[in-house]
Amino acid sequence: MNDPNGLCFWNGFWHLFYQGYPPEDPRQHWGHAISKNLIHWEDLPYAIYPNPEGRCFSGSTFVEEDRVIAMYHGTDAGNIVAVSTDPLLLNWEKLTGKAVIPIPVQDGSPQEYTVFDPCIWSKGGKYYSLSGGTLLTKPGGLRRAADFLFRSNDLIHWEYLHPFTEGDIFTLVGDDGACPYFWPIGDKYILLFYSHMSGGQYLLGDYDKVRDKFSVFSGGLFNFGASTPSGVHAPSSTPDGLGGVVTIFNMNPGMDTKGWNQIMTLPRLLTLEND
């Protein structure tokens, strides 16, 4: 068991998906568990199987009135959208049967964006998605965390807009922006993500909905020490409906484990206090 994915509330249950695989197919699938209280969980059959992608990596969900949308990274393909309408989210249909945001062709030229772990939301009748990754810094060729913004009318055809965050002085050179989740919190917005170098992190700021930019004014770590082996890693989060954000991380059980055999944390409720 590895990253938690797609935490959401649907039809009276909390749903948590996660990277896992059955004994007969050692490729990442999306496992699935449900809970009434975020503490006691019941495991369900695997929700999403890898095809045509090599493996189902991390992603998020977006709940609409009549369906739940999942968007995740499929290795060797790109970012994939699947939808479900049934009461327990047991059955998922992948739109188009292929990646809706394919991995760019590597031809040696500079890349505008990277395609990796996505999150998804809607605004003004359109869908928006972040793709986690890095930006090349100059001089020196070092990389910094970045998340790249895409927009779509129909979940199938996506256009690339630009790097999403501005004013980030809180992440370090060498961080990346994997497993992003972007949600309102209080009267601000929070971007949660995972750096393979520094562990779970967040950025806090204002969402300029005209320019589609995230102006950052604060940030921090979810670990107060080393991120491995016992720190928290990838987040999965969803709004609580009251202005807060519920988040679950994965973590090693206090020691190094083989094959990313990890555990999930207790849920954290993130809220924004007045200055």
Regions found by a protein language model. Give the residues of each.
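Repeated scaffold domains used in trafficking and secretory/extracellular systems
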Residues: 57-59, 178-180, 232-235
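Beta-rich carbohydrate-recognition and catalytic domains
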Residues: 1-117, 121-173, 184-229, 248-275
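Structural secondary-structure packing elements that flank or coincide with functional cores
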Residues: 238-242
